Amino acid sequence: MELRVANANGSCENGSIVSLYCSSQEVLCQIVRGISPEEPYNATLITWQERVRKKYGFYIGVGLAFLSCFLIGTSVILKKKGLIRLVATGATRAVNGGYGYLKDPMWWAGMATMSAGEVANFGAYAFAPATVVTPLGALSVLISAIFSSYCLGESLNLLGKLGCVICMAGSTVMVIHAPKEEKVTTVAEMASKMKDTGFIVFAVLLVVSCLILIFIVAPRYGQRNILIYIIICSVIGSFSVTAVKGLGVTIRNFFQGLPVVRHPLPYILSLILGLSIIIQVNFLNRALDIFNTSLVFPIYYVFFTTVVVASSIVLFKEWYTMSAVDIVGTLSGFVTIILGVFMLHAFKDLDINQISLPHTHKNPTPAPAPEPTVIKLEDKNVLVDNIELASTPSPQQKPKVFMTDS
């Protein structure tokens, strides 16, 4: 069997027609993309990868975000149980600078689960915009709230369950209205955006505020105010998200055959990511050691998401290409998620369930106040008539005279 190739016009430019002859069969092919000898051998594979990414990349990113939420929500429970066991042994607590939890297998199981969740989160940021992946973290709040009621004995009443449903509704709205296209595709573009003056000023403000919280505010008020440790974790978390996003672009460019190994940005981002994870784990353990899990995680999610979305707006400018309807929809979804998280936390101590709900009544209307007793002053004639004599007065007794003023 002989295969012959013939070109009608003698040109190999894009759009040219090439004929393939095999025995008595003829096939006409059109050149869509030419590959020069200088291009890498996997250029055809790159084209296929790009087609798959453009068509399914957004949904792959959302799926990885859901998986990440499940793993991270579970890891919080495991780490909390490890910290509880540490307190039971009498060792130095994490909030007091102790690191005894490093010897607890339950805590390490939580760290392993969280690492797997972060890997899935890493992949999600590589495929989907940060304004989609980060708000979906509300589902990890939902998962931790459900598991904490079964594993840690923390109650989840009817309003808490309703808050979970509201979180899922808000996440769905955000996914529908979030930007589908990612504008940063190369390491050079990522480096150019990080050199932008607006992002540099924003990053400097975050670093300065974080240093003030760590070295001045946290030693004095960290054990009394839950917001101190959570704000530190949230601010540092925004840098970790930026680093993950940049490393995701680096990995894609590496498999596309682009020269990214010699670029300094991947190494800088790796250093930022490592430092961010260490600081986050340290202060998140302190918050979990003192405060309730159902209190720490929802508040942490709200602050973390707010800072990350602000960072995404400054760095990637993903919102600039969105329509007004999508912007309003995304903000509405985010506010809905915050309301759901608020319901999870604010009403967690109320004893409200499906059984007691029908018997819940409004406070009864208070009875009207009784009228004040009015003492009516009698006149002198009535007073005289009402005098009762104990007995008939004897002649020796002097008469009693009552004086009344008229």
From Swiss-Prot:
Record has Zinc-finger as a keyword = no
Query: Which ranges make up the Cytoplasmic topological domains here?
Result: 79-126, 177-197, 247-263, 317-326
Report TM segments: 58-78, 127-147, 156-176, 198-218, 226-246, 264-284, 296-316, 327-347
Q: Name one GO cellular component term.
A: plasma membrane
One Pfam assignment: Mg_trans_NIPA
Carbohydrate-modified residues are: N9, N14, N42, N292
Biological processes, Gene Ontology terms: magnesium ion transport
Extracellular-facing ranges = 1-57, 148-155, 219-225, 285-295, 348-406
Single GO MF annotation:
magnesium ion transmembrane transporter activity
The induction text for this entry reads:
Up-regulated by low magnesium ion levels.
What the protein does comes down to: Acts as a Mg(2+) transporter. Can also transport other divalent cations such as Ba(2+), Sr(2+) and Fe(2+) but to a much less extent than Mg(2+). May be a receptor for ligands (trioxilins A3 and B3) from the hepoxilin pathway.
Q: Which family does it belong to?
A: Belongs to the NIPA family.
- Provide the protein name: Magnesium transporter NIPA4
Species assigned in the record: Mus musculus (Mouse)
